[in-house]
Amino acid sequence: MIRPEIYCSIAGGGPAITYLAGGAAAVDARARVLGWAGASAGAIVATCKAFGVSDEVIREIITSVLASGKALDFGVANIPRGGLFSLDVVGDLLDLHIGKGAKMGDARTALVVGVTDLDHGCPLMLSKARHPGVLVREACLASSSFMCGVVPASSIPSLGTDLSPDVRLFGDGGLSHNTVDDVWDHKPEPRVSLALAPSDAGVRLRPGDIPGILAAIPRALLWAAGQRRSMRHGLDVDIDGANDWAFVKSPARCATEWAQGYDSAAKHSPWFLGVANPTHSLIG
């Protein structure tokens, strides 16, 4: 069966990236993805996919970090990390599995990594086409810096050199454009955008519910920016999964969330392929 050609975007999700990574695997199994885009934790998965890292290795990367507690390592300037990985861990994993010194221009497919230009208060889309000389490690460090404060441009020289010298600080890509779902709008091929499903509207936040409040912030930003919308030739896939902002997870939980994300995305496969068995999961 001929797989259709599409482009795929992966939203940020913090430690819930387990679900979205599973969803990305389901899409990749059913279509020929011509380009990957991502912001925040989604940028890490998108970059790995664009460089041909296998789904098994991506799953192992996420599982090893969350199961080991490395997500709570201290980051830049001893600021405790609250995101998926500490910045050093992200860089080391990308160097190991993609290659030390790899640049955006080396990706096998089109690639877009969303970061936030804090000096100008706007999103900045780093791409293989426009920023081939930017180091993959540094692009992902800037994009996945959620709750680590900011990333000084001086610490990611390939960004500072390739872009404007008046950019001093970068922030997490999810702060300004968490879904990066419109970067492929100019392409004639369909676009599939993966994001966590909205939470139950009946669940009320309570004072002191830190995980719930953290999960509500990006949803509010998405609403304000009007980024969740219907596209002329695309599909917004809401991945079923709960983000409780748990930064330490057992391998069994990571596997379960991966499988749930895979099956959630696979249910949409008839839209672009007509798969007879859309509930097949990567995890047995």
Please describe what each predicted stretch is:
Residues 1-37, 47-284:
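Patatin-like phospholipase
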Residues 38, 42:
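Gly/Ala-rich beta-loop-alpha elbow adjacent to hydrolase catalytic centers
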